[in-house]
Amino acid sequence: MESSVKASVDSETESSPGVNETAAASGQRLSEKTRQQADQPKTQDDLVEQNSSYVQDSPSKKRKLDVEIILDEKHSEDDGGASKRSKLERGGGSEDEPSPGGLTERKRKLQPQDALETQTRKFQKLEEGHSSAVAAHYNELQEVGLVKRSQSRIFYLRNFNNWIKSILIGEILEKVRQRKNRDITVLDLGCGKGGDLLKWRKGRISRLVCADIADISMKQCQQRYEDMKCRRDNEYIFSAEFITADCSKELLVEKFHDPEMYFDICSCQFACHYSFESLEQADMMLRNACGRLNPGGYFIGTTPNSFELIRRLEASETESFGNEIYTVKFQKKGNYPLFGCKYDFNLEGVVDVPEFLVYFPLLTEMAKKYNMKLIYKKTFLEFYEEKIKNNENKMLLKRMQALESYPANENSKLASEKAGDYAHAAEYMKNSQVRLPLGTLSKSEWEATSIYLVFAFEKQQ
């Protein structure tokens, strides 16, 4: 079965409010206090929030994308789903490198069979090479203890991101419970070392399936789960299974202990962008994420915001941007294909594996194939501003130490020594009658965390 989807999208590059170091001028808001380390005084019930766009007063750039996606749908083995092949045309030219199987008959006659096989092997080797790099990168990441983690330059940044995930997961679990209050099943796609296991336990789910490409990470995830069971003697904990697989290339249903299993939630945190190397990989990721969701189930996650990444890139004088915490480097400006738009991401001096741009309107359109409807998409800043109004969320922010106390007390020091990194907080203190210390993130951390967004899709009845 063949279908053709044509879209002409006029999209104005999105941007969050610009960084402005004058609190009064930028309209910075107060919302919450935080507790830092145990030896620090209680902070005021307000957070000085620095607006988090990377470049001030940078003009929006209007882009017109004329996209034609041709999908060849074939019957699959598991549940009548479809795999697809794409041809992406822009200005009459294809952005995707054609595979041997997509060549016309005329080209086949001009190219010897052994050359075709060589080309196929090269393409497969490139794909396998990137998947192996992703697995190797996460396998090599060392487990870090709580003490060392608290000394990290990005301690508060990580905690803030973790708070975002906690609120997202808790909110969606509540939505599921409005429909059913027991036997909640979850698929954690790209689970890593199991950083969200505690969230699922607190959410009182019944069953969890964890899947990730990195085998060592999966072993560590499973060990965390076993340790959690041992610590909770008589307390109920969900059952779990652990699958090592490339979720952008392998069909997970074939690896489930129960091939008839369906889920209420699929969570994919900071991972789905790896699948946008090609349409086929992005579709397999969505098939794994959404193909086995119950009606009314949710696909949720966090991912880099392509509009913000491109906005910062275009505002930069080079092919890269960032600060001392993070850097993003593209191969070139002005050419952003829908698939395979690679960039290198570096966090706190650690070189990460290549990532791929996710054009979110395309993700939304592709998800419709699996009967998914976008419920919301928000930048981290938008999500924070909305959720911090809830008192329980405020308390969780403090417990998770997701904000830094400013100014630091005499027994501690600020996370950043960079000049101007707390100018927004200092300026606010001058112009407001507040109790100290305040809760905030450094300017550098705001810039790093504001490249992300949260999303939630719902499976239609």
Swiss-Prot record:
Its EC number is 2.1.1.56. Transmembrane segments: none annotated. It is found in: Nucleus. It catalyses: a 5'-end (5'-triphosphoguanosine)-ribonucleoside in mRNA + S-adenosyl-L-methionine = a 5'-end (N(7)-methyl 5'-triphosphoguanosine)-ribonucleoside in mRNA + S-adenosyl-L-homocysteine. The keyword S-adenosyl-L-methionine applies. Signal peptide: none annotated. Residues 14-29, 49-58 have a biased composition (Polar residues). The modification Phosphoserine is found at residues 11, 15-16, 58, 94, 99. Keywords: Methyltransferase, mRNA capping, mRNA processing, Nucleus, Phosphoprotein, RNA-binding, S-adenosyl-L-methionine, Transferase. Residues 1-117 are annotated as: Disordered. The record marks 193, 199, 224, 273, 355, 452 as: mRNA cap binding. Its main location: nucleus. It is an enzyme of class 2 (transferase). Belongs to the class I-like SAM-binding methyltransferase superfamily. mRNA cap 0 methyltransferase family. Interacts with importin alpha, leading to stimulate both RNA-binding and methyltransferase activity. Interaction with importin alpha and beta is required for its nuclear localization, importin beta dissociating in response to RanGTP, allowing RNMT-importin alpha to bind RNA substrates. Interacts with elongating form of polymerase II and RNGTT. Interacts with RAMAC, this interaction significantly enhances RNA-binding and cap methyltransferase activity. Catalytic subunit of the mRNA-capping methyltransferase RNMT:RAMAC complex that methylates the N7 position of the added guanosine to the 5'-cap structure of mRNAs. Binds RNA containing 5'-terminal GpppC. This is mRNA cap guanine-N(7) methyltransferase. It comes from Rattus norvegicus.
